[in-house]
Design a protein with these regions (language model features):
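Conserved NTP-donor binding/palm subdomain of two-metal-ion nucleotidyltransferases/polymerases, i.e.
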Residues: 1-96, 102-352
Length: 352
């Protein structure tokens, strides 16, 4: 590694949100070969990441306590849970927010609790009362870098078919996190959710395939028939295959034997993997153009009628970005749906 440009390597790792993973692997080798200036830069970044993780964990416990007192069931997804599952440490994987899943019926009291805890709501209560569904219910703490996102079965619109939230709650488990057990999805459901989440973001950063590969490698106990059924229930078989194939092609983690037969015969998934490999080096800085995005969504949704239905629904389902300013509670949903494709054309219409 004598000719390696360490500053560039660390910069790329940061852009792909895998700096913590790189640091953990270098630690295993005793940081052999890394120059002093690069080592100091890496250690500084890791200290910052660990302090952030600790502050977010403390905030999480406050929220869970408040939700518990109000009898609001919630599940922690992504973020520190994925870091623990994939790397054995909630602080290894970088994340910017806490993601909590609650039932749609509980979203109003859950939002009010976060407001009472000092968070500022990005989605006004008037919009919730009007029945509008954002992409997520985002909360920010003024003067801090703490973000919380509430999700429901209705905001997870990137599921090809509706999320079966009661099934997820029925299979939930408690996981250790910094000395305390927290409510989480079962291992198989978390894996499927993260494949869907990676597909949502076009797998633009190495972080998402790395998570899938690490979870598969660390957990031989995964019940693959349960994974397959969970993906089938929500129409996400293609997304699951792509996630597993990316783990194999990019990280060298073989597609599990239990999944190999279906994955290896999935030509559409292999084509999608090649597409991802083409744009992955840019780490999302050169996003796919509009038509490329549309075709990717169509194929990721299963192709044919199912994929077309998935693409049309995503194209015509307004989020908070489509709501008219000051009319969050009154805007015509039909008009918002009509405007959405034009907004997407303006945002992604230019090639690259």
């Amino acid at each position: 590694m004598g000719n390696l440009d360490w500053n560039l390597a660390l910069e790329l790792a940061e852009e792909h949100s895998v700096l913590g993973v790189v640091a953990a692997r270098l630690k295993e080798t005793g940081y052999g070969g890394i120059p002093a200036d690069a080592w100091e830069k890496l250690q500084s970044s890791m200290r910052t990441q660990h302090l952030f993780s600790l502050s977010m964990t403390a905030e999480l416990f406050r929220i869970l306590d408040a939700f518990g007192q109000a009898s609001i069931e919630t599940l922690l997804v992504k973020g520190p849970i994925v870091s623990f599952l994939a790397y054995g440490d909630p602080a290894v994987r970088s994340y910017v927010d806490l993601d909590l899943l609650v039932r749609d019926a509980a979203i109003l009291p859950a939002c009010r609790i976060l407001t009472a805890l000092g968070f500022e709501a990005d989605v006004p209560e008037s919009a919730i009362l009007a029945g509008k569904i954002p992409g997520e219910y985002l909360f920010k703490r003024a003067g801090a870098q703490q973000l919380v996102e509430l999700h429901t079965e209705k905001t997870f619109r990137y599921y090809p078919r509706p999320m079966r939230i009661e099934d997820l709650y029925a299979r939930k488990r408690r996981m250790p996190l910094e000395g305390r057990d927290v409510p989480a999805l079962c291992l198989e459901d978390e894996l499927v959710l993260n494949c869907i989440h990676g597909a949502k973001h076009f797998w633009e950063r190495l972080m998402w395939p790395a998570d899938i590969a690490a979870i598969v490698a660390r957990h031989p106990e995964i019940a693959w028939e349960r994974v397959r059924q969970a993906a089938r229930d929500v129409g996400a078989e293609q997304m699951l295959h792509v996630g597993l194939m990316l783990g194999e092609s990019l990280l060298g983690v073989a597609v599990p034997a239990e999944m190999a037969a279906s994955a290896n015969t999935d030509g559409a998934a292999r084509e999608l993997v090649r597409q991802v490999e083409g744009w992955l080096p840019t780490a999302g800085y050169v996003p796919p153009a509009l038509l490329q995005r549309a075709m990717f969504r169509l194929k990721m949704g299963g192709g044919g009628l199912a994929g077309t239905s998935y693409l049309v629904r995503l194209s015509l389902s307004p989020t908070e970005e489509d709501w008219a300013e000051g009319k969050e509670e009154r805007g015509s949903r039909v008009w918002e749906a009509i405007k959405r494709p034009f907004r997407l054309m303006r945002k992604y219409g230019q090639d690259g």
